[in-house]
Amino acid sequence: ENKIDFEVCGKIVVAINKEEEERLIQLKNNGEKNGLTGLQLLNPEEFKKIEPNVEGVQALWVPESGIIDYKEVANKLAEKVKSINNSSEVITNCEVKNYNNSEIKTSKGTFKANHIIFCGGLFSDRLAVKDNVKLNMQIVGFRGDYYELTEQAKSKVNNLIYPVPNPEFPFLGVHFTRMIGGKIECGPNAVFTFKREGYSKTDFNLKDTLQALSFSGTWRLFINHWKFGLNEYKRAFSKSLFLKELQKMMPSLKIEDIVVGRSGIRAMALGNDGEVIDDFKIIKNKKNIHV
């Protein structure tokens, strides 16, 4: 309908030990409860027919998983917004200066609306505070670094390869993702970033850092997961350690098979107690809605 590239390619979730094998069964049950069909638990002989280079004790096959070009999704949504009527606009590179219940002042003019919906991502908490919303949470940025498989190594991955999530940690773990266009990404890690939009390892912003480190939830997260966090930082600066993590599922992968890729920032919503808020938090404040 919208001519956006996508592919339902399927995914395997790989258990590498007995403990993960038990969680894999629970994962399958959760998927079936949520309406997924065709889920299968596969032994090594079976899952190697799908991903010959993967090693593990068991895998969950998720045939309905797929990939899509998210940039094209965003562009198509923008087109649809613009086509609603002559007053519909998509305005980019625009800073919010101030606002009240019906008026929002920005770097590109003042706009009036009966309702304002804020989806500010990394800055959603600051926008909410500007709107006099009292929060018991804060956004803390975590950078995820990726590597990519070289052209010669792409044949090692056919579809999507994921680890079994560890419920003790608020991060998924490194995985192999085939992208629309042919690239295969490996990662990410998860490291605290000293700038909310800090896509580089050396990025720093004093305001962002002070706000994050003066928040009780940040320190409680650090204390609860200090060992995990330390290992993530080591991997951020060591290609060989990053590779070692990938080799847990694909031992045949070599250091020359991976090259540095892109980075992304996760806008992690943390409660005052240091617990990660896993779902969207939607707050209504008079006529405004904050996500």
What are the roles of these predicted feature ranges?
Residues 60-115, 119-126:
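Helical element adjacent to the flavin cofactor pocket in flavoenzyme catalytic cores
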Residues 99, 106-205:
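Flavin-dependent oxidoreductases
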Residues 213, 219-291:
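C-terminal catalytic lobe of FAD-dependent flavoproteins
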Residues 14-23, 60-79, 231-241:
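Short beta-strand to alpha-helix junction loop
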Residues 1-50, 56, 174, 195:
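Dinucleotide-binding Rossmann-like beta1-alpha1 core, especially the glycine-rich loop
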Residues 39, 87-89, 288-289:
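Short, conserved active-site loop motifs that form the nucleotide-linked donor/cofactor pocket
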Residues 6-9, 91, 136-140, 253-264:
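A short coil-to-beta-strand element that immediately follows conserved catalytic motifs
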Residues 1-6, 193-228:
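Glycine-rich active-site loop/strand segments that organize a redox cofactor
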